[in-house]
């Protein structure tokens, strides 16, 4: 249970490595990372988008495969190569007319710290670093890449009366 008024939430922003994918990365022969993504996380992201909850990514990484996957699932804001994530976060708020208390940010490590100090509802996977776990309003029982995004989104959609509330829920 998230101890926050989830009715206020209009957007959920995710980091990628350690949140949407596991903490480990395989490398291809060119030195590029290969990530494994959770299908149930993907289902929840596309459902949230259909139900009007904005989902976004702010990551330091750069992967065309990640961009394509999440845009396919309905994300309109996929920010990559963000060396200072807080600047991208502030731009996101301005562009969408949102305030900190409208946002859940799901992060797992120190590069997420500044944003998580600002947002109304900071959340993290169970395997996040200690500093992030301590500052989170909600620590998912799921590890990054293993259902954490689904867990957070399902709690938000249920609280807003949008989980399985329309025929949109029963397909991709």
Regions found by a protein language model. Give the residues of each.
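Non-catalytic pre-domain segments flanking phosphatase-related domains
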Residues: 1-16, 162-172
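Asp-based phosphoryl-transfer active-site loop
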Residues: 7-25, 116, 149
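Conserved functional loop/turn residues at catalytic and ligand-binding sites
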Residues: 13, 17, 52, 74, ...
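A positional/architectural concept
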Residues: 20-51, 59-60
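Acidic active-site catalytic centers that drive phospho-/nucleotidyl reactions
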Residues: 15-17, 41, 108-112
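Substrate-recognition element of Asp-dependent hydrolases with the DxDx(T/V) motif
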Residues: 45-68, 79-80, 116
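Mg2+-dependent phosphoryl-transfer enzymes with acidic/Ser/Thr/Gly-rich catalytic loops
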Residues: 34, 72-73, 77-78, 86-172
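Short coil/turn segments at beta-strand junctions that form active-site/ligand-binding loops
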Residues: 8-10, 53, 101-102
């Amino acid at each position: 249970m998230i101890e926050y008024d989830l009715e206020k939430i209009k957007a959920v922003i995710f980091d990628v490595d350690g949140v949407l994918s596991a903490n480990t990365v395989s490398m291809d022969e060119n030195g590029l990372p290969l990530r494994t993504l959770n299908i149930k996380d993907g289902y929840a992201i596309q459902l949230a988008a259909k139900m009007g909850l904005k989902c976004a990514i702010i990551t330091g990484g750069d992967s065309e495969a990640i961009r394509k996957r999440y845009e396919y699932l309905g994300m309109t804001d996929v920010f990559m190569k963000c060396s200072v994530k807080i600047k991208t976060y502030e731009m996101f708020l301005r562009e969408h007319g949102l305030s900190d208390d409208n946002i859940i940010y799901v992060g797992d490590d120190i590069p997420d710290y500044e944003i998580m100090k600002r947002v109304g509802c900071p959340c993290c996977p169970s395997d996040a670093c200690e500093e992030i776990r301590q500052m989170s309003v909600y620590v998912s029982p799921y590890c990054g890449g293993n259902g954490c995004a689904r867990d957070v989104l399902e709690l938000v959609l249920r609280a807003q009366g949008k989980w399985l509330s329309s025929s949109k829920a029963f397909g991709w």
